[in-house]
């Protein structure tokens, strides 16, 4: 009895899946300190570890909170932890959470003043602000119609900077506004949006006189929300808004010039790493947020003014040959920069602008001309996916010199309108990524959680650029006890199924794994790229996201059911169907309905969106059908199931094995000749066959899509059948009209399994109204005998008088 009770208790703990982590509080902490944090959400049962995407933070004292809605921990932040956003996930015994963020800063934290019940602010008027010191980070909330005021003391000539992390905290579309006010409540500096910080803001000013200054924080339209958290940095730190040059070569030592700070340009020498990174300006203290720097092996030139026309295009001498890059700034009003380069005939070049992608406000427009003829060759405004950076593919028509110009779409300019133009050959590239599972939830199924002793199929999507190739898919760093099976990817496939299978004794653990695709012929490789969209809004686009080449992969606690797939050992033929049998093996105590989908289908093969194994059942049939042009081939298919855990404790997701499915050539084709009849008049439908492959024995033929009141019995055919007449019975009330959807299902049996062909689509049966019955000829009726009354005889008309008689008569009178 005790053992049974222990089993039931342990099994009940299994029925809690997909931990839902919503926020980590506080939203950040100071480097070199320990911070007690709370993970809040739902179904946070039995926390195991925090998965960090960047180094610099360690965890101790990870423990469950008072219920499944919270987890407590202590973050130990290293003194050399990178400033800014740190991405992480919480792994519980039964799953891995969505990615959430924690921000590391350089200053100690201050909490916004609240009443004892934490319901109201104590800093919502200019007259009664919250007093703070410089070089602190305030953790606050911008409520609806809320304005938060913080007062700080400053000296004349001192730099006072403020920067806010709001939207970038990744909860909602928060648009903060910040201002620095003097004692008379006049704004001496303010900012709403900035290209560098997206919808977050920052401003900096040289203090005009000693005294108290007030910092105002609010939502720009006063549309606050209890989830509009912010981190407000206040201090004497530098706050430049741009850096030049914006790029360099790997390992190169260059001098960066940070501009936009009120004290003037800040110069800083730096050795560039091997890949793109972000640089902090340091002047006493550091900028809270860094500025992006691109790293590329391309040779580059920094612009030299004047270069505002094709004749003045830079450089005038020693023209660089493509590939090359140019750096510049559209600094003056209406500025247009021109550059010269040398091209060779038939070079396939891609001209790519980096502006918004390196957080410049520039909305670029580029045009390319031949220096010899001064004729325009091509131009472009927005082409880069996700940002309004220009991109232009250009085939050099002949050897010679060419000029390219760049300007802002609206003619804007400024010291922060920095750009980089890369002119380089179009190189082939490949990569893979997990496609979004839901339009408004970019994180759904973006982690790979495999129940112990079970399986999961994921379907990466392939991106090929300037190459068509087959691919091999490999991994590095999977958890112990987890095996991956991936097919060889044909060049015509843009998606493919990958099976992960966890051993029954696999340790519950996780890793940040990397995956690679490789063209076995050329040796070209590409990464598995992932973009987590923290804040995105339908057609408005993505406001804050995180890009990574690491995927969270975990072995989690065992699931209460498993899935098996049976694929008949016969081919699926074009215009045919095949039934897949899906069996669920349920553990005692679990009997929830199970929704089953086929996550990947071979080309030309279709299936229902989903099928369901209802409560009390353990089997379901999923029917595949093939288009007429489905390519012949051998494929691997599997199915994935989702079910709600008992007591609604999350979603369970797992898959079957991958099983071989053959799409083969059809055995025959047929055409249905048009037939016509009348209601109540039986007739025949003639089908003529085109035998493509011999088959053994007899096949069954069934005529489908007959109208109401019309039936046809199944028929038998053989491999040598050329034509068949199918008797049809037509009732008196059969639907009249032209019925043009008839088709025949021909079922051939092979090794006891059916091979269904659906053929002759568009066959026509016309049921005409019966002709009207001929009218009977009526016999003429005999007229009734009527006795006529004798009418008085009329006097005969008088004979007209002749002229002579008329004269005689007149004379007599």
Predicted regions, residues:
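Short beta-strand and strand-turn-strand segments in soluble, beta-rich domains
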Residues: 55-56, 386, 476-484, 599-609, ...
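Extracellular/luminal low-complexity segments enriched in Ser/Thr/Pro
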Residues: 73-81, 268-272, 459-463, 467, ...
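Acidic, Ser/Thr/Pro-rich low-complexity intrinsically disordered segments
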Residues: 17-61, 66-70, 79, 90-93, ...
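Ser/Thr/Pro-rich low-complexity tracts
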Residues: 16-142, 218-229, 233-322, 327-331, ...
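Short proline/glycine- and polar residue-rich coil/turn motifs
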Residues: 63-69, 80, 195-197, 207-208, ...
């Amino acid at each position: 009895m005790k053992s049974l009770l222990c089993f039931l208790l342990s099994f009940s703990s299994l029925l809690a899946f997909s931990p839902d982590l919503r926020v980590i509080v506080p939203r950040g902490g100071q480097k070199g300190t320990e911070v007690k944090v709370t993970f809040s959400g739902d179904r946070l049962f039995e926390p195991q570890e925090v998965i960090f995407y960047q180094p610099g933070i360690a965890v101790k004292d990870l423990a469950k909170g008072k219920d499944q809605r919270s987890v407590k921990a202590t973050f130990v932040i290293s003194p050399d932890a990178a400033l800014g956003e740190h991405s992480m996930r919480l792994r519980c015994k039964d799953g891995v959470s969505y990615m959430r963020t924690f921000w590391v800063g350089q200053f100690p934290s201050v909490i916004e003043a609240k009443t004892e019940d934490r319901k109201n602010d104590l800093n919502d008027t200019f007259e009664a602000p919250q007093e703070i010191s410089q070089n602190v980070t305030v953790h606050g909330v911008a409520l609806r119609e809320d304005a938060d005021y913080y007062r700080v003391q400053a000296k004349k000539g001192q730099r006072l900077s403020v920067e806010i992390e709001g939207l970038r905290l990744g909860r909602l579309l928060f648009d903060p506004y910040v201002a620095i006010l003097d004692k008379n409540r006049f704004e001496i500096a303010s900012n709403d949006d900035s290209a560098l910080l997206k919808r977050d803001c920052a401003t900096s000013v040289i203090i005009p006189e000693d005294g108290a200054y007030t910092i105002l924080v609010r939502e720009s339209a006063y549309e606050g929300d209890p989830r509009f958290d912010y981190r407000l940095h206040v201090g004497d730190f530098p706050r430049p808004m741009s850096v030049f040059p914006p790029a360099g070569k790997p390992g190169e030592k260059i001098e960066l010039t940070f501009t936009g700070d009120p004290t003037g340009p800040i110069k800083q020498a730096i050795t560039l790493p091997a890949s793109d990174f972000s640089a902090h300006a340091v002047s006493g203290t550091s900028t809270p947020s860094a500025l992006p720097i691109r790293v590329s092996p391309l040779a580059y030139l920094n612009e030299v003014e004047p270069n505002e026309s094709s004749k003045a295009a830079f450089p005038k001498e020693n023209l660089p040959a493509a590939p090359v890059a140019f750096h510049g700034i559209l600094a003056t009003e209406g500025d247009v920069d021109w550059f010269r380069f040398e091209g060779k005939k038939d070079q396939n070049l891609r001209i790519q602008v980096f502006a918004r992608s390196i957080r410049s406000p520039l909305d670029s427009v580029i045009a390319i001309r031949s220096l010899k003829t001064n004729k325009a060759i091509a131009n472009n405004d927005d082409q880069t996916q996700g940002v309004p950076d220009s991109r232009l593919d250009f085939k050099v028509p002949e050897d010679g010199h060419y000029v390219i110009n760049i300007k802002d779409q609206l003619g804007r300019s400024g010291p922060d309108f920095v750009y980089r133009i890369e002119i380089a050959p179009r190189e082939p590239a490949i990569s893979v990524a997990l496609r979004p599972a839901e339009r408004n939830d970019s994180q759904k199924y973006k982690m790979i959680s495999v129940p112990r002793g079970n399986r999961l199929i994921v379907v990466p999507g392939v991106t090929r650029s300037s190459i068509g190739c087959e691919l091999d898919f490999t991994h590095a760093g999977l958890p112990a006890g987890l095996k991956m099976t991936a097919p060889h990817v044909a060049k015509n496939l843009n998606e493919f199924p990958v099976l992960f299978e966890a051993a029954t004794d696999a340790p519950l653990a996780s890793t940040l794994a990397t995956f690679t695709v490789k063209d076995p012929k050329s040796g070209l490789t590409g990464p598995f790229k992932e973009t987590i969209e923290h804040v995105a809004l339908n057609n408005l686009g993505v406001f804050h996201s995180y890009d990574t080449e690491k995927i969270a992969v975990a072995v989690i606690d065992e699931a209460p059911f498993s899935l098996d797939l049976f694929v008949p050992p016969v081919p699926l033929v074009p215009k045919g169907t095949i039934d897949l049998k899906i069996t669920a093996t349920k553990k005692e105590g679990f009997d929830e309905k199970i929704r089953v989908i086929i996550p990947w289908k071979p080309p030309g093969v279709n299936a229902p969106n989903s099928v369901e194994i209802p409560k009390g059942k353990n089997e379901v049939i999923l029917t595949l059908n093939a288009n007429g042009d489905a390519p012949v081939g051998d494929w691997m298919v599997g199915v994935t199931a989702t079910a709600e855990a008992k007591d609604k404790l999350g979603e369970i997701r797992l898959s079957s094995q991958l099983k071989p499915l053959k799409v083969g050539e059809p055995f025959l084709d047929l055409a249905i000749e048009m037939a016509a009849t009348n209601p109540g008049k039986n007739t025949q439908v003639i089908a003529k066959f085109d035998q493509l492959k011999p088959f053994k024995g007899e096949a069954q033929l069934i005529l489908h899509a007959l109208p109401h009141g019309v039936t046809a019995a199944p028929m038998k055919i053989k491999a040598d059948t050329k034509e068949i007449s199918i008797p049809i019975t037509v009732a008196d009330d059969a639907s009249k009209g032209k019925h043009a959807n008839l088709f025949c299902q021909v079922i051939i049996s092979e090794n006891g399994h059916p091979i269904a062909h659906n053929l002759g689509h568009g066959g026509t049966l016309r049921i005409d109204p019966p002709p009207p019955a001929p009218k009977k000829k009526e016999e003429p009726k005999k007229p009734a005998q009527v006795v006529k009354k004798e009418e008085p005889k009329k006097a005969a008309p008088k004979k007209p008088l002749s002229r002579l008689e008329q004269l005689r008569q007149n004379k007599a009178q």
